[in-house]
């Protein structure tokens, strides 16, 4: 559990660093691709933080079972995959209103948390004694597919990225 938690914290720090780097370098970008990904990692990292705190042994969310961290993990991965896909639309244009993306990400984050914690409408991902649910398994395939699809515009428009980014 300690190793897993350390790896989770490391990934959260990396997500925060990606956001900080992209945000502070935004005026130097010729397009909005990296900035969009950077902003999305702020939200992905926050969900990952809540995911890490949601483990049973942490005691932060009493009354929840092992489904909660699994739901949060899937929510973060969906957000991450969809952000990589959406970012490809900014390969040939600047992101002129990054605060709008921040506001949109905040709304998405709030809706995700409401669906998991308050409305409890987010599909179950893990059932104690049974294991992973079909939704969680299908989600992993769907997430992988979206990430693969996101590679296509990147390879077609790789000239839109700075040569050092392509290395």
Give the predicted meaning of each segment.
Residues 5-10, 23-47, 96-113, 130-167:
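Alpha-helical transmembrane segments of multi-pass integral membrane proteins
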Residues 52, 70, 88, 106, ...:
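Residue-identity detector for threonine
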Residues 1-90, 167:
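Individual alpha-helical transmembrane segments in multi-pass integral membrane proteins
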Residues 52-62, 114-128, 156-157:
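Juxtamembrane "helix-exit" motif on the non-cytosolic side of transmembrane helices
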Residues 77, 81-99, 108-116:
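Long amphipathic alpha-helical segments that form oligomerization/scaffold cores
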Residues 15, 100, 125-128:
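Short amphipathic alpha-helical segments, especially helix-boundary/capping motifs
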């Amino acid at each position: 559990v300690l190793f897993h938690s350390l790896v989770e914290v490391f990934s959260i720090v990396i997500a925060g660093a990606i956001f900080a780097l992209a945000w502070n370098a935004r005026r130097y970008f010729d397009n909005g691709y990296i900035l969009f990904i950077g902003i999305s990692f702020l939200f992905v990292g926050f969900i990952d933080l809540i995911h890490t705190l949601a483990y049973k042994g942490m005691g932060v969310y009493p009354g929840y079972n092992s489904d909660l961290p699994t739901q949060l993990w899937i929510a973060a991965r969906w957000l991450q995959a969809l952000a990589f896909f959406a970012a490809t639309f900014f390969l040939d244009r600047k992101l002129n209103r990054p605060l709008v993306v921040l506001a949109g990400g905040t709304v998405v984050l709030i809706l995700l948390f409401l669906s998991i914690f308050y409305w409890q409408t987010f599909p179950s991902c893990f059932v104690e004694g049974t294991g992973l649910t079909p939704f969680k398994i299908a989600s992993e395939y769907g997430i992988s597919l979206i990430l693969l699809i996101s590679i296509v515009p990147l390879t077609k428009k790789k000239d839109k990225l700075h040569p050092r980014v392509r290395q």
